[in-house]
Amino acid sequence: MGNEFRMCDDCQATNVKTLIPKLKKVDSCATIEVGCQSYCGPGRKKSFAFVNNRPVAAPTEDELIVKIEAKLNK
């Protein structure tokens, strides 16, 4: 089973337009779903994505990608 990335297009700290291409570079075969993730509190302050049903957050998008890559390489 492939990886799954989920993110919210309404949270203030997450820019879906720039994050999706970066996630595709991490794993081009992953499923990407966009919609409310009920993660509004942290989503106001940090860029986040759910990776295989686990939340990953960071102050910036670039830091988020580094954390996601580390999580997938475990």
Swiss-Prot record:
Domain of life of the source: Bacteria
One Pfam family, short name: DUF1450
What InterPro entries does this protein's entry cite?
DUF1450, UPF0741
Which protein family is it in?
A: Belongs to the UPF0741 family.
HAMAP family, alphabetically? UPF0741 (MF_01863)
Q: What is this protein called?
A: UPF0741 protein BCAH187_A5562
Write down the species. Answer: Bacillus cereus (strain AH187)
Q: What is the lineage of its organism?
A: Bacteria, Bacillati, Bacillota, Bacilli, Bacillales
